[in-house]
Amino acid sequence: NLSNGDTVTVTAVYDDYLTETYGCIPESDTKTYTVEGLDSYMTSFDGLPDGALDEVHTDSRDRVESLIANKEQICGAFIDWSTDTPDTYQVDTQNLKLYTSYLLVSKGADFGAKYSNRYIAVYHTTGSMSKKSWFGDSYNGDMYIAVDYKDLKFDESGNLIVNLTDAEYTYFTTADNAYNYWMTSNKDCYKVFEQKAVAPAAAPAADAATADTAPAEASAS
């Protein structure tokens, strides 16, 4: 479990007979080495290079926009968990914004953390939708969609390495629910950090861009 900057001291053990026989005497019995060149996991928002998370934010926004275009999935998440086509569906895409980011840093495997870290980008917008259902038939209000990435790390050159193919989604109707799900409930096994982005977008104006055709918390592991 070494990290860059750690030091390792090596102590030589040798036989006096070999020294006497071959006339070799080491200049020193010990030598200290500094660890370098290792990848290191992201452990804080502090000191991040400018633009370090740009690729993640581009990917997460693309994913959220794609989800919004999939009206059956979004409507299922915010109404009844089914994939039936909604009767009406309207989500504000013009005011879709990154609302906040969470960083969960493992306290160690002994605490039950499955990953070294998790980065969650939470987006906010508003929407309204309806469909006939035994469980509920409509939703109109705030929508918080979170995209979760795992095991972010920096290479030797300081570039952030992220597996963009391994992302999961959770859906919330309030910012507090998103915070409690990701931050509060994970404090037993992760150190948690938040980096607020912007305030929630205002309700869409009459001429705001929307996902055409007329949300309930979701969960992810």
For each predicted feature, which ranges?
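Beta-rich interaction/scaffold domains
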Residues: 1-66
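Short, cysteine-centered beta-strand-loop-beta hairpins and adjacent loop/turn segments enriched
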Residues: 13-27, 126-144, 154-155
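Short, non-transmembrane alpha-helical segments in secretory-pathway proteins
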Residues: 46-92
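Serine/threonine-rich, repeat-prone extracellular segments and beta-strand-based repeat modules
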Residues: 1-11, 101-114
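Intrinsically disordered, low-complexity regulatory regions
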Residues: 86-91, 99, 106, 112, ...
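Short, hydrophobic/proline-enriched secondary-structure or compact coil segments at domain edges
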Residues: 115-127
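A short, surface-exposed interaction/processing loop segment used at functional sites
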Residues: 136-188, 198
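Ser/Thr/Gly/Pro-rich low-complexity, disordered linker/stalk segments of secreted
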Residues: 201-221
